[in-house]
Amino acid sequence: MVTQNKKILIITGSFGNGHMQVTQSIVNQLNDMNLDHLSVIEHDLFMEAHPILTSICKKWYINSFKYFRNMYKGFYYSRPDKLDKCFYKYYGLNKLINLLIKEKPDLILLTFPTPVMSVLTEQFNINIPVATVMTDYRLHKNWITPYSTRYYVATKETKQDFIDVGIDPSTVKVTGIPIDNKFETPINQKQWLIDNNLDPDKQTILMSAGAFGVSKGFDTMITDILAKSANAQVVMICGKSKELKRSLTAKFKSNENVLILGYTKHMNEWMASSQLMITKPGGITITEGFARCIPMIFLNPAPGQELENALYFEEKGFGKIADTPEEAIKIVASLTNGNEQLTNMISTMEQDKIKYATQTICRDLLDLIGHSSQPQEIYGKVPLYARFFVK
């Protein structure tokens, strides 16, 4: 219980929407708890520190999944000693120091891989609890901050990854990845499909085009899925691509088994009302799908965290990897044409999913902050921050 004024500083990043969504889920949950003595502030560290360079890096990151896969693969799978020498480890250092001086937080929460935090925890006794919410299913070195108080991870296998590299097991909690609470609430699937002019007795295949960053080939995929899966209907989410939505709507306007949508705020309802989803294995998207127990097909995952997430879900029986659209269509046909594999996948997900991750994490954060040092004990010593600038 927080009985005196405390402050949580959340450091996040806008490389993709997932980290921001996790941050918002935690902020919303803490706000819902109506804690008068707690303030929560969030900062997109890299964007605030170097807005122009970070914008360029973000564009490269997004395009790397399509055009620069080998380059990103080389970065992601680099040896730890190479990452330690990379400028990325010091990216945003001055901004981070200034944030700590200005905000004087009682706890720092990382929802984005922030290697620069390691510079502070390794070289200075900042005496502030540091916690990390990991948003993927396999460990990468950039998630590790030496001397952290807590890591919140998705699964027991992720925890073992941390233990294998020497992290104290007592600092790693298996909580699941935090997502919006709406993905935990019941949905009337039949009524949702009826309201959207779809047949609740057919198997609904959900496709998220926005996840792929491309706009070609979906018309053929939809046609082939319907041809090879007799009792299927397809919902295509085109995201912000108006051109794709326009072309697909024109092609399938007379087909009652196809619904073409643009950007939607109802992915929760569509996941809850579908039997299978074709998507990219981003950490938050697949966690939302996991919560809704919808088996997934991962189309041509990019090397790095995408591929590692996909391999984990395939290993656990929650999804399947397809290297090509043709392979994805075959998997859809196999799963929807009467065998028990799809039912078994759903059952496995029901058994293994971790509920209410956001609430669990927020309760633990409050426990950590309740045991943290008093502000004057941390910030009353001027030499602490003076050392940052004379190092």
Swiss-Prot record:
It holds the Pfam family Glyco_tran_28_C. Keywords: Carbohydrate metabolism, Cell membrane, Glycosyltransferase, Lipid biosynthesis, Lipid metabolism, Membrane, Transferase. The keyword Mitochondrion does not apply. Pathway: Glycolipid metabolism; diglucosyl-diacylglycerol biosynthesis. GO terms for cellular component: plasma membrane. SUPFAM superfamilies: UDP-Glycosyltransferase/glycogen phosphorylase. Processive glucosyltransferase involved in the biosynthesis of both the bilayer- and non-bilayer-forming membrane glucolipids. Is able to successively transfer two glucosyl residues to diacylglycerol (DAG), thereby catalyzing the formation of beta-monoglucosyl-DAG (3-O-(beta-D-glucopyranosyl)-1,2-diacyl-sn-glycerol) and beta-diglucosyl-DAG (3-O-(beta-D-glucopyranosyl-beta-(1->6)-D-glucopyranosyl)-1,2-diacyl-sn-glycerol). Beta-diglucosyl-DAG is the predominant glycolipid found in Bacillales and is also used as a membrane anchor for lipoteichoic acid (LTA). This is Processive diacylglycerol beta-glucosyltransferase. The gene is ugtP.
